[in-house]
Amino acid sequence: MEIKYISLVDFISSKLFSLDKIKKAYLGLLSMLTDTPDITTLAFINKTYEIAKMGVVYIGYYYDVEMQEIFIVGSGTVIFEPKFIHCGKSVGHIEDIVVHERFRGAGIAKTIVDYLINLAKEKDCYKVILDCKPEIENLYGKFGFEKRGSQMAKYFL
C-alpha cells in the first residue's frame, strides 16, 4: 500500500475522485479527532477554500483498487498568522493533526507534521506552534517541539 500526500485543495482540484467521496473520507477521518457534523459537499468545498486562504490542509491518502474506495489516512493543517512583531513575520499554527486509527504508528503523523513545519519555514514564519493533549506531548517532542508556557482556551460551543 502506497500512501500519497497532497494538499486538500490540490486533491479536490485533481478530480481523481468524486467530491462526495473525498468529503466522506475526510470528515470520517476528522471524526476520529473531534465531533464532525456532516455538511453538504458544497459547504465542504467552500470551507476547504476558505481555509486555503489562511494556510494549508495536507492529507495522506491511498486508493484501494479492490474496494474501489479512497481512504484519507492522515491530515494536518497549518494556518499562518501575520504579526507586527518579529519584523512582521508570521506564526504558523499547526492544527488538527489526525491519523486514522488503523494506520497509527506508521509514520504518517511525522510525514504530515514535517511537511507543515517546512512549509512554515518557506513562508518565513519565525516559529511554528501547536497545542496537544498532555498524553501526546512526547510524540511532538520527537518532532522537535518543546513545551513552552501553557495553553488556555474559552470555548463557545
Question: Residue ranges of each PLM-predicted region?
Answer:
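A conserved beta-turn-beta hairpin within the catalytic core of GNAT-like acetyltransferases
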Residues: F71, P82-I94, R104
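Conserved catalytic-core motifs of GNAT/GCN5-like acyltransferases
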Residues: F80-K83, I129-E137, G141, E146-L157
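Conserved beta-strand in the GNAT
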Residues: I59, E69-F80, V98
